[in-house]
Swiss-Prot record:
Chain positions found as N6-acetyllysine: K6, K11, K14, K19
Main location: nucleus
Protein name: Histone H2B 1
Post-translational modification note: Monoubiquitination at the C-terminal Lys gives a specific tag for epigenetic transcriptional activation and is also prerequisite for histone H3 'Lys-4' and 'Lys-79' methylation.
Domain of life: Eukaryota
Subcellular location: Nucleus; Chromosome
GO biological process, one term: defense response to fungus
Length: 21
C-alpha cells in the first residue's frame, strides 16, 4: 500500500498525512 498522501494528496491531504504520519 503506497503512501496515501502521495497517491492522492488532493483527495484527503489532511487524512492522508494523519494516516501516513
Amino acid at each position: 500500500m503506497p503512501d496515501p498522501a502521495k497517491t492522492a494528496p488532493k483527495k484527503g491531504s489532511k487524512k492522508a498525512v494523519t494516516k501516513x504520519a
